[in-house]
């Protein structure tokens, strides 16, 4: 049964399309008549949060987006950053949260497919993927099913397409029970002088449809992604798209081959709102109109209506504006790769978006008002109150420090993620230098003997909830720090801002404050935001997720032979901590997982110290003086030392004698701007003298060697015991053995 194009427009139909009464009135004022059913669908798709950023645009404009290496900032399919020698890195992160909750395998798979398309649409060959995943509490009845489906979906698509997954995050919290997060990142490499944009240029040029055929999957997907969930969630399953990574691989090769011919004027992938969004964006950006003839669109289902074709989110599709004389050559390339190639319209000079189906004009709308002049809101917001200070002396010390550390490394959130990343192909393409499990993934740049890129994705949602401003700063700082810990120079970042319902002032306040914090940190660290995505309405039955502004960054290693890892220390090396003694236990995992409390403020991020300490650590690594390096984050110094010992298989003998403060704060405090370095014994004094000269605080902590982590008389844990505890939680959880392994 198809939907006829003449369907009465009722208040229920308008509300069902996610349009508020005042927005519908704006449509009437704009076009001077009642919209057709297809036009209503087009407005609904273009004016929802997912496509228009109407609640967030005002604040996103405040982010720093320029820098000496930035070739293309936000507004295109992905950001583009110069990496020298005529090369650039193209990258972006994007959410596929709502679809992944409804249909975890396909939701996650098409999230990966969509972000890869964003990268190769720009003319770049994808070289790395990451994903940041948040699930509900481990003992929630749906969590295991969702983890299994999402991880299979991410792996199934990425592995088949042929891109290595080099990093990411997996976290559990009850606040994601009804609304998981799947944030997918991809990066590719292109020539700086061969970047392809989505802005159409020239009148009367062919608009070409490329790739897979159009079906009914995903109709209304963008609208679904702009609404809160409720009990009717099962009914939304048809709005999840279905992906085919092999078609996408062919699409990648065909696009890159066609781009070499000079035929491509503009190109846009079909993502949210499919044909509607890609056509409107290409025309509106180039100040051109677009005429589409739907009878020419390749379809895989019969009797599809204009409404369905315009809003389908079938995967593996592109829209392109071509040089007319290259039409035959272009068609031959796509046919060779077994893909559809159809001229479905042309550019016009009237700034109208016109759609014709079966001889009938089913839409005729002002293209600018759909695209870059969509509604924009300045929503009311209020700052959230900050938790009271929590001095370390008010926090109980553990009865047994070794037990407390085992509990942390074997907990749901600090345990090894090996079960997850072993399902991903981390080595395909043969350029992976650092795999998941360290501070950042590192990938060699093909064709260069020494150059590599480092990638990391970070956010600490519990900090953001306690203090959105400091939490926003911390997400950026930790990403920058993880990249720095490999020896790379952080170049730029992409953001994926996941929040609840922006119509609630307290949620909008979280968003505004987090964006302000992100902006301040990016400016202080010269780490511009070049692309990104906002996902709002992440709520179920009125319960919002933890505010989760994920930051993914890229760094450049001019010489990867000097790169640092977390597990490459040698026997006899000296252990040095860079940064201040641990003192901050508010919002720490020690507080949460050992003492079962979520009190206290988030740690403050001193951006001057962050930069000074990070620049110093990078110089030590680049001077070939560091044998290993690890940043200190969740779990504090104790967890960082345990992770280094487990990664290297070598023990550590630690003496806190130089440190000032209570032992539980020194070991489990989550103060920022800190690293652990191991250096050969004969350069330890030299490194410390240089630190002093640079005004960088440091502590000599001890020596590498033996088969246990020993901290004064507080902790003595054999590495094997640490590893067994660290590695067992995830497999035990997925196989349903014991409720929580470490408890």
From Swiss-Prot:
<dbReference type="InterPro" id="IPR036676">
    <property type="entry name" value="PurM-like_C_sf"/>
</dbReference>
<keyword id="KW-0479">Metal-binding</keyword>
<protein>
    <recommendedName>
        <fullName>Phosphoribosylformylglycinamidine synthase subunit PurL</fullName>
        <ecNumber>6.3.5.3</ecNumber>
    </recommendedName>
</protein>
<dbReference type="InterPro" id="IPR036921">
    <property type="entry name" value="PurM-like_N_sf"/>
</dbReference>
<feature type="binding site">
    <location>
        <position position="535"/>
    </location>
    <ligand>
        <name>substrate</name>
    </ligand>
</feature>
<dbReference type="InterPro" id="IPR010074">
    <property type="entry name" value="PRibForGlyAmidine_synth_PurL"/>
</dbReference>
<feature type="active site" description="Proton acceptor">
    <location>
        <position position="96"/>
    </location>
</feature>
<dbReference type="InterPro" id="IPR016188">
    <property type="entry name" value="PurM-like_N"/>
</dbReference>
<keyword id="KW-0658">Purine biosynthesis</keyword>
<feature type="binding site">
    <location>
        <position position="92"/>
    </location>
    <ligand>
        <name>ATP</name>
    </ligand>
</feature>
<feature type="binding site">
    <location>
        <begin position="95"/>
        <end position="98"/>
    </location>
    <ligand>
        <name>substrate</name>
    </ligand>
</feature>
<dbReference type="InterPro" id="IPR010918">
    <property type="entry name" value="PurM-like_C_dom"/>
</dbReference>
<feature type="active site">
    <location>
        <position position="50"/>
    </location>
</feature>
<feature type="binding site">
    <location>
        <position position="269"/>
    </location>
    <ligand>
        <name>Mg(2+) 2</name>
    </ligand>
</feature>
<comment type="similarity">
    <text>Belongs to the FGAMS family.</text>
</comment>
<keyword id="KW-0067">ATP-binding</keyword>
<feature type="binding site">
    <location>
        <position position="532"/>
    </location>
    <ligand>
        <name>ATP</name>
    </ligand>
</feature>
<keyword id="KW-0460">Magnesium</keyword>
<keyword id="KW-0436">Ligase</keyword>
<feature type="binding site">
    <location>
        <position position="495"/>
    </location>
    <ligand>
        <name>ATP</name>
    </ligand>
</feature>
<feature type="binding site">
    <location>
        <position position="94"/>
    </location>
    <ligand>
        <name>Mg(2+) 1</name>
    </ligand>
</feature>
<keyword id="KW-0963">Cytoplasm</keyword>
<dbReference type="GO" id="GO:0006189">
    <property type="term" value="P:'de novo' IMP biosynthetic process"/>
</dbReference>
<feature type="binding site">
    <location>
        <position position="53"/>
    </location>
    <ligand>
        <name>ATP</name>
    </ligand>
</feature>
<comment type="subunit">
    <text>Monomer. Part of the FGAM synthase complex composed of 1 PurL, 1 PurQ and 2 PurS subunits.</text>
</comment>
<dbReference type="InterPro" id="IPR041609">
    <property type="entry name" value="PurL_linker"/>
</dbReference>
<dbReference type="Pfam" id="PF18072">
    <property type="entry name" value="FGAR-AT_linker"/>
</dbReference>
<comment type="function">
    <text>Part of the phosphoribosylformylglycinamidine synthase complex involved in the purines biosynthetic pathway. Catalyzes the ATP-dependent conversion of formylglycinamide ribonucleotide (FGAR) and glutamine to yield formylglycinamidine ribonucleotide (FGAM) and glutamate. The FGAM synthase complex is composed of three subunits. PurQ produces an ammonia molecule by converting glutamine to glutamate. PurL transfers the ammonia molecule to FGAR to form FGAM in an ATP-dependent manner.</text>
</comment>
<dbReference type="GO" id="GO:0005737">
    <property type="term" value="C:cytoplasm"/>
</dbReference>
<comment type="pathway">
    <text>Purine metabolism; IMP biosynthesis via de novo pathway; 5-amino-1-(5-phospho-D-ribosyl)imidazole from N(2)-formyl-N(1)-(5-phospho-D-ribosyl)glycinamide: step 1/2.</text>
</comment>
<dbReference type="GO" id="GO:0004642">
    <property type="term" value="F:phosphoribosylformylglycinamidine synthase activity"/>
</dbReference>
<feature type="binding site">
    <location>
        <position position="117"/>
    </location>
    <ligand>
        <name>substrate</name>
    </ligand>
</feature>
<dbReference type="GO" id="GO:0005524">
    <property type="term" value="F:ATP binding"/>
</dbReference>
<dbReference type="Pfam" id="PF00586">
    <property type="entry name" value="AIRS"/>
</dbReference>
<feature type="binding site">
    <location>
        <position position="118"/>
    </location>
    <ligand>
        <name>Mg(2+) 2</name>
    </ligand>
</feature>
<dbReference type="GO" id="GO:0000287">
    <property type="term" value="F:magnesium ion binding"/>
</dbReference>
<feature type="binding site">
    <location>
        <position position="533"/>
    </location>
    <ligand>
        <name>Mg(2+) 1</name>
    </ligand>
</feature>
<feature type="binding site">
    <location>
        <position position="241"/>
    </location>
    <ligand>
        <name>substrate</name>
    </ligand>
</feature>
<dbReference type="Pfam" id="PF02769">
    <property type="entry name" value="AIRS_C"/>
</dbReference>
<keyword id="KW-0547">Nucleotide-binding</keyword>
<feature type="binding site">
    <location>
        <begin position="313"/>
        <end position="315"/>
    </location>
    <ligand>
        <name>substrate</name>
    </ligand>
</feature>
